[in-house]
Amino acid sequence: MEGHLLAPFLEKDLEKEITFPFLALLVSGGHTLLIKVSSIGNYEILGQSIDDAAGEAFDKTAKILGLPYPGGPQIEKLAKQAVFKKYIFPRPLMKNLKHNNLNFSFSGLKTFALNTFDKIKQESLINKNINLHQEKAEIAYAFQEAVTDVFIKKCKQAALSTGIDKLIIAGGVSANKYLRDKFNSLEKEIKLKTYYPSFEFCTDNAAMIAYAGMQRLLKGEHSPLDT
């Protein structure tokens, strides 16, 4: 995950702009981590998922809605077709936020999506006016909105409690434009400058691993060839 964390440094115009310390929200199919980064290799985990990673929840919710893999881009695309925005999904682990409860939980959102869609399908057997495709779009929007809202509030609390005014968001989920737009609004609200990798560097790639390795080498660190 260090490669994802440092991916924005691959951008020429950002390499000198991003200074330590900063916060990092790493969101992928396998991980969801909120980290305080003091220097290369000096990381403090402030919060993490206690069940499904965010990207995993996107994939599973997409499967529930009959969408192909990978689910993240499919959910984002379908959510743009939402018109009524009538569903409100829960925001897990938001109690005691002011006491720095910065962990995440997304398995319940997936289950909520499943139960909501199952109920709609049952109703559609009786009410032929129900547009299942539109209902899927409404669910996709509500799910995406809930995940993003949790990220926003947790990162805001982390910034306020640490006094850090820079945030990197990286990993596959960071390619979501809805998420980026919402964090741009947060930047104006609390002056939290947010950085992202280019879209081509959001998913796993060799460039970010090479950069992370180079930074370790510059620090004089070496790894045995057999590891």
Name the predicted role of every residue range.
Residues 4-6, 197-227:
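Glycine-rich phosphate-binding/hydrolytic loop that grips phosphoryl groups
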